Amino acid sequence: MEGKTQAEFEQTDYFQHWQAVISDPKLEKLLTKYGYDAVFYPHFEVQRFLSAFHTEHPRVKIGALGQMDVQTLLMESALLITDFSSIQFDFAYMLKPEIYYQFDEARYWGTHHDRGYFDYRVDGFGEVVTTQEALLQAIETALASECAVTPEMQKHIRDTFGTLDDHNCERNHQAIRELMS
């Protein structure tokens, strides 16, 4: 997104796909049916183009950097929809469900990054979808279950992280002290 004008940004697949999602009447119906609100909070590199995004849906908010605290948003959110963001690890650590919307999966791996050790379909913490229709279906499934994480996914998350508690700082401090002695 670096170096793009807003007009150029509005021509990108990224903008067109996410704009289509946040303005989709089906999303509004799902949110209303299950009693949820959504916050579209794009990556900080996209925040400068935030004025390009719009929605008429009262249950869909567009989150601006500085107006919404990311930590609070993560803590208060019941479901995360992301693409390839590392924020997924924070959300999974809280044992919350995720959906990966990877509409540009082939191009992402072909031009942006090399595939590393992490395979979203194997190692990820939620369903990978590549179409808007599949995304809306995954959202409905999650909302209908009150955003519950399946026992299988809970096991996967626990196996990935080992210890899930609020004592990480203490463990890190102790490990550093042991290394220094």
What are these regions (language model features)?
Residues M1-A52, V129, L164, N168:
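Conserved catalytic-core segment of nucleotide-activated headgroup transferases in glycan assembly
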Residues L27, V70, F125:
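Acidic, amphipathic alpha-helical patches
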Residues D37-V39, K61, I99:
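A structural signal for isolated positions on well-ordered beta-strands in alpha/beta enzyme cores
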Residues F40-P42, T82, Q102:
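Short beta-strand/turn micro-motifs composed of small residues
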Residues F44-F89:
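Donor nucleotide-activated moiety binding/catalytic core segment of transferases
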Residues A52-H57, F84-T160:
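Catalytic binding pocket for nucleotide-activated donors in carbohydrate/polymer assembly enzymes
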Residues D165-S181:
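C-terminal alpha-helical cap of glycosyltransferases
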